[in-house]
Amino acid sequence: MSHRLFAVAAALAVVVLVALLVQTPAAGQNQPQAGKAPAVGKAWTPPRTADGKPDLQGIWTDNTLTPFERPKKLGTKEFYTEEELADLTTRARKGEKLEEADLGAANPQAVRYDLEVYGFDRTKLRFASTKRTSLIVGPEGVVPPMLPQAKERNAERAAKEKGHEFDSYENRPLSERCLLMNQERIPMTPGANEGNLLQIVQGPGYVTLVHEIDHSTRVIPTDGRPHVPQSMRLWQGDSVGHWEGNTLVVDTTNFTNLTAYRGSSEKLHLVERFTRAAEDTMIYEFTVEDPTTWAKPWTAEIPWTKTKGPVFEWACHEGNTMISTILRGARVAEQEEAQKKGK
């Protein structure tokens, strides 16, 4: 066991060092190049690493205008036509420009950042190159309804936490405490523009994912090892990978009930598939299964676009006074309430 732990630690040190060498101190991210969405090449053959595995390395972004769930008005329509996609893209980018102009007019004294440099320029985003109407695949295009037992479980949890949100730092969300940000949770889905970059670094027997946000690092062994014992539970679960042709398949189990994904339980089972479909395109697909939360598994497919980078430094906890200020404010509010009641 000690030799195994030493091997894991050594591999982690190498891949993290490689990732850190290409990072630059700053804040923000790069956007994918504007213009026509890349076609996913069916016959494209990815380059190989020194040990002969498909080379997934690079800096990727999942920024997209495609919604996670399909709008109800589209019904079972799974794909847009070229004409529909072009029209939607034009209107979406125009809307973003108008919104930015309205914000500037409302507060001309506000500090305005260079949105393109800092990765907030949504006018350069595009819909998924797959032309899907939603990132969730299938005729429904939405997350399946939650089972009654799952609704009851989540309601009980919410009721237990109600009124205790500000008791202690342990009652605050993990993101406020800089422990686990939304963009680094798995499965990985598009969120706010900022912090969405992901760098992939490979070594013999390992694939490492380095998130821009919070610099979290996920090391995935691909050497055929089994999952850790069920008694070991982790916020991000236990991930093991293997190769199926040109696709990296990652199986993750052993979640806790503290980091529920969309109301899931510790029974969550996640299968991710990473396929490099073109020089600048990665298809990230994941299937979610939790028999205590949903009646059936469901799948989403998210095209990633390669970007030049660099991955800027993203600082969270340095100079962070959020938690102390929130708790201090809560104590003041409690004192004021007690004074009103004459206590």
Regions found by a protein language model. Give the residues of each.
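PEST-like low-complexity, intrinsically disordered acidic/proline/serine-rich tracts
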Residues: S2-K343
